[in-house]
Amino acid sequence: MGFNIAIDGPAGAGKSTIAKLAASELSYIYVDTGAMYRAIGLYVYRKHVPEEDTNAIGETAKETEVSIRYIDGERHVYLNGEDVSEEIRKEHIGHMASVVGAVPDVREHLLSLQRQIAQENDIIMDGRDIGTCILPNADVKIFLTASAEERARRRHLELQSKGDTTPYDVVLADIKERDYRDTHRDIAPLKQADDAVYLDTSNMTIEEAAAKVVELAKAAR
């Protein structure tokens, strides 16, 4: 049985970057559930399935096999055998990940795979409902957040560094829309687990936040 750390929080809070750093420091496996949803979002997008047709999204998701492999320390995400690691980081695929994540059949499709990985390894898993639904018995639970404006600022800088010219206002509006969708969906809405540590990173560097995660993990072992 692995030692499991669950990190939940809203879009753009830096969960992935912080979890990755902490996992490296602890020599744990980092499981990016968001990347799994992005991969399915990409597949649904390619198939031109309407966003509002949840039945079709659920059926289309069943055609996918998503896996994560680490090659020379770098994470690679595979969709039906194709490496989609770069393509899933695009902004419109982030939007699609939020759409498919609200569909029960999609969540069910990924749940067993995520739990199996956690059972067999020491892991840090981040997402929207890890501590509340996927790993309710995780050894450490953290709710990691930052203000919507700070999250939009970070995301805007990241997009600019990749040559993406999406305006800040559009990024902020998208983050607020995703917050609303994630907290109001019927299945596993985003919320802090009762036994989770609340960690606001608005005024922290990524390194400071990762160090806090490592500290919490070591205290719990």
Kindly give the residue locations of the regions a language model identified:
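Residue-level signal for inorganic ion chemistry
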Residues: 34, 81, 110, 124, ...
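Walker A (P-loop) phosphate-binding loop of P-loop NTPases
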Residues: 12
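Small-molecule kinase domains that catalyze NTP-dependent phosphoryl transfer to phosphate-bearing small molecules
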Residues: 69, 114-120, 132-133, 137, ...
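N-terminal phosphate/diphosphate-binding loop that engages ATP/GTP or pyrophosphate donors
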Residues: 25-90
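ATP-dependent NMP and nucleoside kinases share a basic, alpha-helical "lid"
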Residues: 85-162
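Conserved lysine of the Walker
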Residues: 15
